Amino acid sequence: RLTYDEIQSKAEGINKNSPPDFQKTKLMTRDGIDYAAVTVQLPGGERVPFLFTIKGGSTGYDNAVALPAGGRSKPETGEIIGVFESLQPSDTDLGAKTPK
């Protein structure tokens, strides 16, 4: 089963000096596990695409399990507000790349 929910995500402005903007995006739900497509910035500044979840599965559960309870949320939108940190033992993509 695959469903999509429309959400808004904060995106950088068109140029460096413009304010950030919210863009419509979709949250993909596959078999009851929600994934949000995000961009992760690595320590060197490189940005890579990443699928993030806080519901379990292969990404983020062991690191983010306590964050939803400690964070704030907007009940009218269901949005979780906070800074999410995750320690990855490899470079990116859940071990698909060798650490630098």
Swiss-Prot record:
Protein's name in the database: Oxygen-evolving enhancer protein 1, chloroplastic
Region (Disordered): 1-23
Pfam families given in the database record: MSP
Protein source organism: Populus euphratica (Euphrates poplar)
Subcellular location, record wording: Plastid, Chloroplast thylakoid membrane
Family, as annotated: Belongs to the PsbO family.
GO biological-process terms attached to the record: photosystem II assembly; photosystem II stabilization
Role, per record: Stabilizes the manganese cluster which is the primary site of water splitting.
Gene Ontology molecular function, alphabetical: oxygen evolving activity
GO cellular component: chloroplast thylakoid membrane; photosystem II oxygen evolving complex
UniProt entry keywords in alphabetical sequence: Chloroplast, Manganese, Membrane, Photosynthesis, Photosystem II, Plastid, Thylakoid
InterPro entries named among the record's database cross-references: OMP/PagP_b-brl, PsbO
Gene3D superfamilies membership: Photosystem II, cytochrome c-550 precursor (2.40.160.30)
Residues passing through the membrane, by range: none
